[in-house]
């Protein structure tokens, strides 16, 4: 395991050969990029989503090349304001090629998940763990290519994926 960074996360997402999967387990995040847009949404102001351009373009490129990008959001219901906000524009991600599913937290009561919570698995063999402070800000990124960790995270993701609700069918409680 070694320390990593947000820049490396972006490079890994862009550089996949086959696929990435992403498990999100928090009800709220506080990234510097997102906070101003979340604040605007809370005030009822429009957003042109230009700040998502690079991500959406990357997803389109992966889809065109036949690569897959999947995400599961583990959520508490009723949804937090943050989760309401990201759900309000999740269709942009889906239209660009990311397959997103939601799973209410109680459905995972007996499902073992890695203790760090959020992670990405790239091409089935490289894992990045994302660590957060209580207020949702990133505190650290760690990466490993240890086969046992990659296998455990991929299997955990797949078990959650099969129970999760596709974006187009998800209706929050």
Each language-model region and where it sits:
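PLD/PLD-like phosphodiesterase catalytic module centered on the HKD motif
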Residues: 1-173
């Amino acid at each position: 395991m070694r320390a990593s960074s947000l820049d490396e996360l972006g490079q890994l997402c862009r550089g996949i050969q086959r696929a990435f999967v992403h498990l999100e387990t928090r009800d709220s995040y506080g990234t510097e990029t997102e906070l101003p847009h979340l604040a605007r949404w809370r005030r009822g102001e429009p957003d042109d989503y230009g700040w998502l351009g690079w991500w959406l373009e990357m997803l389109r490129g992966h889809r065109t090349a036949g690569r897959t990008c999947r995400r599961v959001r583990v959520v508490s219901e009723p949804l937090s304001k943050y989760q309401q906000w990201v759900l309000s524009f999740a269709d942009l991600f889906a239209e660009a090629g990311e397959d997103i599913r939601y799973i209410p937290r109680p459905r995972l009561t007996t499902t073992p998940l890695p203790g760090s919570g959020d992670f990405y698995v790239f091409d089935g063999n490289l894992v990045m763990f994302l660590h957060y402070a209580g207020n949702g800000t990133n505190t650290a990124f760690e990466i490993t290519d240890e086969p046992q960790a990659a296998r455990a995270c991929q299997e955990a993701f797949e078990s959650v994926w099969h129970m999760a609700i596709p974006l187009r069918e998800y209706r929050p409680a």
